[in-house]
Amino acid sequence: MQFSKMHGLGNDFMVVDAVTQNVFFSPELIRRLADRHLGVGFDQLLVVEPPYDPELDFHYRIFNADGSEVAQCGNGARCFARFVRLKGLTNKRDIRVSTANGRMVLTVTDDDLVRVNMGEPNFEPSAVPFRANKAEKTYIMRAAEQTILCGVVSMGNPHCVIQVDDVDTAAVETLGPVLESHERFPERANIGFMQVVKREHIRLRVYERGAGETQACGSGACAAVAVGIQQGLLAEEVRVELPGGRLDIAWKGPGHPLYMTGPAVHVYDGFIHL
């Protein structure tokens, strides 16, 4: 099986063309391939499939390193767009794809960045899903013997965003896994730790569902900005500084889609016998 290794700000992927190859991935195989000592090593596996709708170009599937399939990965979407162009699967700059829960448009810019229409953030608890009696801008949660204030949003996948004074000292390794599996998130959640530098700039670390802390999380950056704007903390255009680098997020508020712009890097091509 041929594959490519790619990354978006250090969030790394194994990308496989299932348009011209016949492939099947069991959870066990994915876990083996994801092992950084015994396999290829990656945060997520991205699979390019033929479209199910003639109006679309491709179907986009995402698997976490633990073998679970998820519906959204922003950094992966940028790598997906670069991959299908690099491999000659399309020469379009505007690439329309379906995912497990919707559709996306990926745009390759003139300076080789990728701009992704991530859709409109959904703050309804049932959409996340998150157990709450009604939608709030801020929720109070109990975890690890602490009282935590957070915002909750779906970017096609579930996110919880906590504001911290300093991301460098935030309890990502200890609080992240506790909140990821909290009973109020029946499908688990990605946990973002956000430091507001100013209205146009945040620093962010994300403990990803099924992957742990990564160098960058695109949908996590979108979620943090969406929550920050909803809570009145941020402007409509925000620079997000992650351990792996920078993303630019723009959202005009309810009724509008949110846009993420950032890089996607091809590292190498490989072949593996399964």
From Swiss-Prot:
Its EC number is 5.1.1.7. The active site is at C73, C217. Pfam families: DAP_epimerase (PF01678). One of its GO terms (cellular component) is cytosol. Disruption phenotype: Cells lacking this gene show an unusual large LL-diaminopimelic acid (LL-DAP) pool and an important variations of the LL-DAP/meso-DAP ratio incorporated in the peptidoglycan. InterPro entries: DAP_epimerase_AS, DAP_epimerase_DapF. Keywords: Amino-acid biosynthesis, Cytoplasm, Isomerase, Lysine biosynthesis. This is Diaminopimelate epimerase. The lineage of its organism: Bacteria, Pseudomonadati, Pseudomonadota, Gammaproteobacteria, Enterobacterales. The gene is dapF.
